[in-house]
Amino acid sequence: MAQIRIHEVNTRIENEVKVSKFLQEEGVLYEKWNISKLPPHLNENYSLTDENKAEILAVFSKEIADVSARRGYKAHDVISLSNSTPNLDELLINFQKEHHHTDDEVRFIVSGHGIFAIEGKDGTFFDVELEPGDLISVPENARHYFTLQDDRQVVAIRIFVTTEGWVPIY
């Protein structure tokens, strides 16, 4: 279950109902998908082959199709980041630059952890700390950035409005 940390006051929201309500009020789509469907050989596997990535997409194809139909998404892929990722530190520096997109940024966490820091409607940033099974859609034009948690590893399904993917606006 995702948790929220509000930056300026360092307040945490950990209750599932309160997290969902907070995100809904901020216009952030949040869903919990059944991660137990993931085959054991893909759980916490950060060295994925193309076949592994295709298998992950197949496992969650129904959920991807459902959210895509509801929200108009047209493409998806799988990304894996870990200490074995070449240039991980450089990638994280780039991910941590505050930006926005003219379409939603959608991620479903398959393994590991990630954090989206999002500017709230009142101008205060909050972290959404994500774990396996969490799906988030950062709304279009919302200022945000992404980083990893202390374990520095994540496998995520990215879902896009267009086949070209997101274009960050810094």
Swiss-Prot record:
InterPro entries: ARD, ARD_bac, RmlC-like_jellyroll, RmlC_Cupin_sf. Ni(2+) binds at H99, H101, E105, H144. The keyword Amino-acid biosynthesis applies. Fe(2+) binds at H99, H101, E105, H144. GO terms for biological process: L-methionine salvage from methylthioadenosine; L-methionine salvage from S-adenosylmethionine. Its cofactor is Fe(2+); Ni(2+). Keywords: Amino-acid biosynthesis, Dioxygenase, Iron, Metal-binding, Methionine biosynthesis, Nickel, Oxidoreductase. Its EC number is 1.13.11.54, 1.13.11.53. Disulfide bonds: none annotated. It catalyses: 1,2-dihydroxy-5-(methylsulfanyl)pent-1-en-3-one + O2 = 3-(methylsulfanyl)propanoate + CO + formate + 2 H(+); 1,2-dihydroxy-5-(methylsulfanyl)pent-1-en-3-one + O2 = 4-methylsulfanyl-2-oxobutanoate + formate + 2 H(+). GO terms for molecular function: acireductone dioxygenase (Ni2+-requiring) activity; acireductone dioxygenase [iron(II)-requiring] activity; iron ion binding; nickel cation binding. Pfam families: ARD. Binds 1 Fe(2+) cation per monomer. The record marks R107 as: Important to generate the dianion. Pathway: Amino-acid biosynthesis; L-methionine biosynthesis via salvage pathway; L-methionine from S-methyl-5-thio-alpha-D-ribose 1-phosphate: step 5/6. Catalyzes 2 different reactions between oxygen and the acireductone 1,2-dihydroxy-3-keto-5-methylthiopentene (DHK-MTPene) depending upon the metal bound in the active site. Fe-containing acireductone dioxygenase (Fe-ARD) produces formate and 2-keto-4-methylthiobutyrate (KMTB), the alpha-ketoacid precursor of methionine in the methionine recycle pathway. Ni-containing acireductone dioxygenase (Ni-ARD) produces methylthiopropionate, carbon monoxide and formate, and does not lie on the methionine recycle pathway. PANTHER family: ACIREDUCTONE DIOXYGENASE. Monomer. Belongs to the acireductone dioxygenase (ARD) family. This is Acireductone dioxygenase. The gene is mtnD.
